[in-house]
Amino acid sequence: MSKHIFFISLLFLSINTLSAEELSNVDVTSSVFSNSVNESKYPLHIMQNEEINVNKSIGDNLKGLSGISNADYGSAVGQPTIRGLTGNRTRLLSNNISVNDLSYISGDHINNIDLNNISHIEILRGPSSIFNKGGTSGGIINVISDIISEDKYDNEVFKLDYNSVNNGYGHNILFKRNLFDINMYLSINNIKKGNYSVPHGVLYDEGVEKTTLANSDHKNQNMSFGLSIPREWGYFGISFENNDGIYGIPYHAEEEEEEGHEEEEGHRLFTKVETETYTVKGKVNTVPFFNSIDYSFRNSNSFLKEHEEDGSASLDSNSNSLAFTFNLDDQSYEKRLLLEYNHTKSPMTGAYLPSSESYDRSLAYFLRTKNKPYEIDFAGRYESNSRDSNSQKYGDTSLSFGTSLSSNIGEALRYNLSYAHVSRTPTIAELFANGVHGATSRYERGNNTFSREVSRNIELDMQYAFNEIDLNLNLYRNSINSFIFLKDETTTTSGKTDATWSQKDAVMQGYELSMSRTYLIGNNNLMVTLSRDDISGVFDDNTYIPRISPAKNTLSLKYENQKNDIYYLDFIYSESQGDMSSIETKTNSYLDLDVGYSKKIVLDTHKDLLFNIYGHNILDKAIRNHSSLIKDHVPMAGANYGVDVSMRYKF
């Protein structure tokens, strides 16, 4: 019934003849190209700063977007998934440089990204993502801030934030100003969240109902500092970021096997993470043979320690990355050449992975037509990668490429037809795992004889503007050779379930449909967006790929008046998922309703105050996320409410 209501709403929106203000196409300049390459015609999402909740994980923030799901492991860990593709198939960037963390090797590891004070988040697919990073069969999620800026700050500010949520709080300080022709950026924030509440009747321990989820707490501190010097010849910038946090592991499979164990609260299972990142970025406009050269160097040391009752395991990732982007534009084409090198040392102690080293070397080229009634994009990428442990070695070379054709049919319809051939080198976990992974209570085994994973994706994107309504439809089919996945076995080792990294050919296909319209009500605006996405994932033996999210229907309303009042509502109806692998159980459908209100109060020309009041899952429905490794044992949070207060002084 809910699905029928959703489609009736779509029909109502399309035939409604109330006077409305046309929602024009917004040109978006993607930051992965530093020289203003327009990305607005691609299957692309942009989430602006005011839409982001810093108390949520990045996956939880993005899950309402079509084609995006959240692979959570409790409230702290939320890894974004694009069209069912997880791990390093979906690459997370910070200001165009890969984020150094351990999330790509396991679903219980947190993304090392700070969402405070960012400008926006952009999601890219197609030739753009192939050019920028290797193995991105899912796409790129790029988190943008101006900690290093190639332009002089025009929004100099001192800001204080306070927020409360989940029996906890958070606060943030931001100082951003240009002094002595130097951009100065300083951000300090911390967050402390307690165990979250769960809906009535969804969680029991030995027959006793639980109202909160043990070990769902999260504490984190972050400090970021940046200096940048913008000049006519280009710019130069440096930054330092430190992240230090602790988060609970809300599920430990071993507890199911124990008899007469203590109360759940007595089992303190948690992970400590710390990361230090140093970045140098710049651009030179006056160089022989090129229009400009962009360069970046990042040194990042990420430390993760899993604490359990029977000991601890330490996993490190010490990464050095270097990149040069050359602008070769001429009158007929926009062209880029990228040289990239990354070396990662991963010392491990007591972990299910051996110590290892990874080398990634790549050469990429991007071309786009100019001044034509159509646009053709092409990206090619050559990679030479190696993964070495003390006793095992793996190496390969690969070629990835993608192309797209975009054009108008009449004045109302625009289409983009694209094809991408993407090769992905296996990760160190997929190759070398051999031991007990405590957080998931599995004995994982890798395979260093794996072949490269190769995806071939064809996609049609259509954008149609009719009677002040914007329609967007994406159709895609992704055939993947040697798809790598973790398969649970029926045997055990050392009391843990055996889990083997395996390969099979697979096909993922689906669609994404969205419709939006802005209504002018007096002098106020009401933005209405409806969307639906659906995906299927099947192996060549007609079994299902694990943890493929079910069909999702979304309604978003945003009402803004002339008095700086903003009201918003986000409603998600996730359908049941019965297309499951042999290691999964069926996931029931659910409703998820979030609401909020924000008010900006201008105190004078220099000071303003912003209030934001919000509620998540206000219907207090039981929500189990099919994309999660632990959905059967860890429900999502019940109804919870929060307040953000921000005082801003503009210089």
Regions of interest found by a model, annotated:
Residues 115-157:
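A beta-strand signature from Gram-negative outer-membrane beta-barrel systems
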Residues 194-196, 423-424, 480-482, 486, ...:
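C-terminal beta-signal and adjacent terminal beta-strands/loops
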Residues 25-53, 79:
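N-terminal periplasmic "start-of-domain" segments of outer-membrane beta-barrel proteins
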Residues 332, 369-373, 475-480, 497-580, ...:
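Gram-negative outer-membrane beta-barrel transporters
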Residues 98-125:
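Short acidic/polar hinge/loop motifs at secondary-structure boundaries
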Residues 259-287, 393-394, 408, 421-480, ...:
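Outer-membrane beta-barrel signature, preferentially recognizing the C-terminal barrel domain
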Residues 214-220, 234-293, 297-319, 346-350, ...:
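Flexible loop and strand-edge segments within Gram-negative outer membrane beta-barrel domains
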Residues 142, 150-153, 157, 177-271:
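Periplasmic-side early beta-strands and strand-to-turn transitions of outer-membrane beta-barrels
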